[in-house]
Structures are given as C-alpha cells and as structure tokens.
C-alpha cells in the first residue's frame, strides 16, 4: 500500500471486493479510443481474477480516496532481452474522468519507481492521447522508434 498527500489517495492491490467497480472502469476504458480492442466481459473478468490470484505475471492496483475507487492499473511482468532486465508493462492505466488532473498518474509512477528499482517500465499510448503522452514524458518515459505488432491466436 502506498499513500500520497494529494487528495489522501491510497494505492493498493486489487481485492475481490473491487470487482464490479474495476470491471465498470475497464468497460469505459476499453470502449475509448485509448485502446485498440473493445475487450469483452469475459476478458475483463479473466484479467481481474488474474490480478487478485497468485498469478506471477500480472498485478492489479486501485487508487482509492475516502473508500471511493478513482482509477485502476494492471501491470504485466516479462523480461527484456534488449535491456537485460525485468520489464513491467503498464497494460492498463485508467483514472475516472472527474479525477484526471489531480496528479494520480504521477503518484502511481512514483509508486512504481519505489517498488520496482532497476526495472524497465513500458507502456503503449495512442498518438492522439496528448495529455497521457505529456504525463508519461514528465514521468521519464521516452518514445521508442518501434512499430508494435501482434499475432492473436485463438484456440
């Protein structure tokens, strides 16, 4: 748990009690232009349960003030052979619209810097998401010259 002095915000790991609110936020996030796919309730539930289980590859956090969840984040763990160290992918970072601009994102990146020392942090952002890009650059992220590609195999 991490406590900030801005709005008395606490960053804590997700718990089962957070399910409805986190999934509601995921539905908003995944229906926005910030992501490539719209997801589905099945995917959102799988992601949520992976975050609250002992799955070593994913962690989920919520940002809370006075018992209200203001946003959430999901992190995926991997290893970067290019940089020779652990890599944390910030898969989801969502803050409810009415709480944006309150430095919650900055507080979350400070939190990550404290718990993940000497770890590569990566994320994806749409070119049009200027406020997010500004936050990420202020937090020390750099634009990479790569194109992101994927192959989505369904069994």
Q: Could you tell me what each predicted segment is?
A:
Residues 109, 116-126:
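Conserved GNAT acetyl-CoA-binding A-motif
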Residues 27-50:
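Conserved GNAT-fold acetyl-CoA-binding loop/helix
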Residues 106, 127-145:
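Conserved active-site alpha-helix within GNAT-family acetyltransferase domains
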Residues 50-62:
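A short helix-loop-beta-strand connector motif used in the catalytic cores of GNAT acetyltransferases and
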Residues 9-24:
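A short beta-loop-alpha structural element at the N-terminal edge
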Residues 60-62, 68-77:
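Conserved beta-strand in the GNAT
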Residues 99-111:
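Conserved acetyl-CoA pyrophosphate-binding loop and the N-cap/start of the following alpha-helix
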Residues 122-133, 149-154:
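Conserved beta-strand-loop-alpha-helix junction that forms the acyl-donor binding cleft
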